[in-house]
Design a protein with these regions (language model features):
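Sec-dependent bacterial lipoprotein signal peptides
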Residues: 1-20
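Generic marker of residues within folded, mature protein domains
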Residues: 5, 12, 43-47, 83, ...
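A structural "domain/chain start" motif
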Residues: 21-80, 98, 165-188, 192, ...
């Protein structure tokens, strides 16, 4: 009898291991996301920049899905017209997703503070993070728009009146089991933060204050 009871207790203990792992690696939700920032997207002085935006996303992690469409949707809510032709855009937004995955929460601040184009390697465990660099180019748009085959960099430089950069880090203070990628709310929170920053740089669109930086 004691041996049978011991065997049952052992089976019960083993069955709880996957359950505990699931608790530690829950997906979480958008309300848990902390936003860290370095740099800012600035206004273009007194220039009259059309409220037309073009969004380009480079995801070097393949872990953040639908970020482009989310960013376009949020910009639309802020009063921008979104175009798929960069030569028609007054606001060209380049989003580079640099890292996504496990991180030591206390180490993320230094990575974000490294700023745009700085070191971007995440290290440690205990949290989950997304790191992105954002380049905003504001430009005049000629009234006569001709089709162009120039690349995005040339279009951004043409008629540019201002550019600014920022780095964003999104942090959830627990481990998340990464399947195909990060949970969808990471892309939504990042898109919302970007749209608010771009709207503030526009100065006329609906610029609700961003969530508090940490």
């Amino acid at each position: 009898m004691p041996i049978a009871r011991l065997f049952l207790l052992l089976l019960l203990g083993l069955s709880l291991i996957p359950l505990n792992a699931c608790v530690r690696q829950r997906d979480g939700d958008a309300g848990e996301v902390e936003v860290l920032r370095s740099g800012a997207l600035n206004r273009a002085g007194d220039e009259d920049i059309p409220n037309v935006a073009y969004v380009n996303v480079r995801d070097m992690t393949n872990r953040v899905f639908h970020l482009g469409s989310q960013a376009e949707a949020w910009l639309g809510r802020k009063g921008f017209t979104v175009t798929d032709n960069p030569s028609q855009a007054g606001y060209i937004v380049q989003i580079s997703v640099l890292a996504a995955g496990p991180v030591d929460p206390d180490s993320l601040r230094a990575v974000v503070d490294a700023g745009y184009d700085g070191p971007s390697k995440l290290s440690g465990t205990g949290g989950t993070a997304l790191l992105a660099d954002v380049l905003l180019v504001q430009r005049r748009v000629p009234s006569a728009r001709r089709p162009s085959r120039a690349n995005l960099k040339n279009i951004s430089n043409r008629n540019a009146v201002a550019s600014s950069q920022m780095r964003l880090g999104l942090l959830v203070r627990h481990d998340i089991r990464l399947k195909a990628g990060l949970p969808p709310y990471f892309a939504d929170v990042l898109a919302r933060e970007l749209s608010t920053a771009i709207s503030a740089a526009d100065g006329e669109a609906d610029a609700s204050p961003p969530s508090s930086a940490r």
